[in-house]
Amino acid sequence: MLGCNAFPGVQCGHIVDPADAFMFNQINAGNAVAFPFAKGFGWGAEINLRYMFERLFEVAPGGGYPPERVEPEQRNKKILDAVNEVTHRDMVTILKELDPALAKGAVSGSRFQELFFANCKDEKIAEAVRELLAK
């Protein structure tokens, strides 16, 4: 979850149960979730997982919970979004500012390159990776 939240445009929530899922959708209106599959996912886990997905998608995000708190929650979400916009940078900038040896090590595998270049939808990111590999 924390790793996801480090990237621009990602707001990930930790969802343990259906109540978490509902409140994350209503209060945070994020776009990614993390499930603790190694904890509490034994007998009947598929039921809990189904209920969590139902709560995530049963109503439009950002409606607030409780409903009478919608205005301050939406105001706070806008503040958080503005902070994230300033503090999170685009992937091209991140790739250029990381330690080149570290970044190159992350993208130099042949299988990574095969899958990445076949599926990358952002030419600027693809070009940044090519430049990194050429170093």
Question: What are these language model-derived features?
Answer:
Residues 22-135:
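C-terminal binding/interaction regions
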Residues 1-12, 16-20:
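Short Gly/Thr/Asp-enriched flexible loops that form oxyanion-binding sites at enzyme active sites
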